[in-house]
Structure formats: C-alpha cells, structure tokens
C-alpha cells in the first residue's frame, strides 16, 4: 500500500473517532439534562403533595391528589 493510501485511511479513522466521541458527549449532555428535569419535576410534585396533605389533614381527611390546582380530600381515595 502506498503512503498516500495509508495517510487517507489514517485520516478517515481519526475523523471517525472524533465524530463518535462528539456524539457520545452530546448523548451524555442530553441524559444529564433529562435527569435534572426529572429531579426538578419530582421536587415540585413533592412540594405540592405536602401542601395537599397539610390542607386535608386540617379536615381530617386523606389527600387524593389535585384537580385544577386544588387539593382533593376524601375519607377514602378511589383510583
């Protein structure tokens, strides 16, 4: 094989390695952003659930969730 052929193959290999490394970095950044979003969403849900529990506790009932932003309280939650 000529030197030119070896240089071309080496260059192609380097391009392949660099692009695959960039793709891995983008995937990792996307995964990190998804985890951060999931954590924020669970934190806000937890805060809303605590508010619902406190509100229904005053009425001596169980919090069954929220509907239109308002806590739903009942003796027993169905479904």
UniProtKB/Swiss-Prot annotation:
InterPro entries cross-referenced by the UniProt entry: Conotoxin
Q: Which UniProt keywords apply?
A: Amidation, Cleavage on pair of basic residues, Disulfide bond, Knottin, Neurotoxin, Secreted, Signal, Toxin
Sites where Leucine amide occurs are at 78
Residues that make up the propeptide are 21-44
Point out the signal peptide segment.
1-20
Major subcellular site: secreted
Q: Where in the cell is it found?
A: Secreted
Q: In which tissues is it expressed?
A: Expressed by the venom duct.
Give the highest taxon in the source lineage.
Eukaryota
What family is it from?
Answer: Belongs to the conotoxin O3 superfamily.
Regarding domains, what does the record say? The presence of a 'disulfide through disulfide knot' structurally defines this protein as a knottin. The cysteine framework is VI/VII (C-C-CC-C-C).
This protein is called what?
A: Conotoxin ArMSGL-0123
């Amino acid at each position: 094989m000529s030197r030119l052929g070896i240089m071309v193959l080496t260059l192609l290999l380097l391009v392949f390695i660099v692009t695959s490394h960039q793709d891995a970095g983008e995937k990792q950044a996307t995964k990190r952003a998804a985890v951060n979003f999931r954590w924020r969403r669970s934190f806000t849900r937890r805060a809303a659930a605590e508010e619902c529990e406190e509100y229904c506790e005053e009425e001596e009932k169980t919090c069954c969730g929220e509907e239109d932003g308002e806590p739903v309280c009942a003796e027993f939650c169905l479904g």
